[in-house]
Structure formats: C-alpha cells, structure tokens
Amino acid sequence: MMMTTTIEILWQQLNDIKKQAADLNLRFSQATQKLQEDGTPFSENLVKELTIYRQDFDKICTETQQFFSSPQTVPAKIASLPDIERLLLTAEVAKIPVWHHCIDLGCGVITPGGGKTSSPQTEQKIGLPESLAGMTVLDVGAWDGFYSFAAEKRGAKRVLATDSFVWQSPDVGKGGFELARRVLKSQVEDMEIDVLDLSPEKVGVFDLVLLLGVLYHMRHPLLALDRVFSVTGKQLILETHVDMLDCQRPAAAFYSGRELNNDPTNWFGPNPLAVKGMLESAGFRDIKVVNTSQASGTCARMVFHAWR
C-alpha cells in the first residue's frame, strides 16, 4: 500500500508538471520574443539562458515519464527515491526564467546561477563571519537569496531579505527566492522595499547588513548609504564595482547610458577612496578593503567592511 501511494503521489506530481508545460512554453516564447525585440547584448544573453532552461525542462519531463514507463520496474526504481526527488526538483528549478545565484537545494540539485557573485566560495570572499550565532542580518538586494540563506546557516537568529527591482521585474521576479526558501525549509523573512525606503521604522535595525552588488545601481548612492546606515546596528559588508583606480584622490565615473556591461541600470563607479569617503559621510567608521577581484584596467570589484 505504501509503495502504491508513493507512486500515485509522484505520478500526480508529474501530471501537474505536464499540465504546466504548455503554459510554460508559451511564457518562454513570449519572454524570448520580448527580449529579442529589445536587441541588446544583455537581452541576447537572457535569450540564451531561457533557451537552455526550456531545453532542460523538456528533458526532465521526458526522463520522468520514462522512469514510470515500465510498471513492472517501478518498484525497483522506487528504491532510489532521491533520484525521483531530484528529477522533480530539477523540473521546478527549470521553470524559473532567470537564476542569479548558485544555491545547493539538496538531492544533487544546484540552481544554475549566472551572476558574478553566485558561488559558495564567495562567502569567504566577502568576509562573511563563520558564526553569526544570535545575530540579526539584513540582506539588501537579495535576488535569489544566496547570502540570506548562508547567513541563516551560520546561525543568525533572524534574517530579512529585501529587494524591489528584481523581485518586481516581470522578466525575472521572486520565484527563485521563494522556491529556494521552500525547499531549504528556511525561516528567512522577506520584504519588497527599495533601498531608499529603508528605515528603522519600516525594517528595524540589524547587527549585520549586506549590501552586495547594489551601490553602483543607485542613482543616489549617498542617500542610499544614509538609509543603509540608519538600519545598521554594528557592521556593513559592501561589495561593489569600482572604477578610476588610476586616480589618486576620491573620484567616481558616471555612466549615463550603457557604458558599464551594456546595462542602463549601472550609474556610478567610485574609486576606493570615494567609497571610503561616501561611507564616512554616512556615519560609518573603521572602513577597510578586504578583497579585490576581477581587476581589469581601471576597474575592479571590491569588498569593504565598515562599522557603525
């Protein structure tokens, strides 16, 4: 009876996925057409990713159907239940249009993140403390939530993930974060709120604030840091793009169009001295650079630690 029930449940899950396939293919086609009309290199890359995810989804559905195709062999196959769970979970992952972070969901399934800060090794690169026991953590611009879940795993008693631009985007959305949180059985909280709307009254004050890959997207970076300072109780970890490394005084490059990575949402590339000055003007102290990567010409990525 138990074996039959398990098979029925899994078969129903497969049928549910198959019913969604037609709608998913339509959504894939609509999104692809919209991105192709945009015609930018960034959009072209997204089209390539969408195509890969669509192929993966079709492949997983086919593999799962084949798994149940021979009734006489199903009992033996059920002995390897994690393989079935992996197939079903992979199918869910493939339904998410765009993944930014690589998140280990278990069962051998890792989300296909394409972001520059998307691998587990970056926990060390940003200097995330080994233990966050008893601490509260705010992850600003969380996207898929990789760092939010990492903070939770390190013992944080409360983690709040916030985002607005990505989560409210019709082409990306919040699905990746919600899927990862459900599968990981995470208690991470979430709030859709813009950086410039952060305040102690709206979100509270946190021992540790993560501002990773966000600052250069801000049209008003100084105001953004003021808002971040207001909700920082102890420490800020800031990761950002920097430019004008050849300038020996505080300076920042301004990107009025698509100069940086052909992305119109990138606005400023301050050099390290400018970042330090901006953090100090917001009220932070004891500011230091803890990591530099992807250096190219006058540009790089840098991680700063600062305290209140």
Model-flagged regions — what are they?
Residues 196-202, 206, 210-211, 219-308:
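S-adenosyl-L-methionine-dependent methyltransferase catalytic module, highlighting the catalytic core
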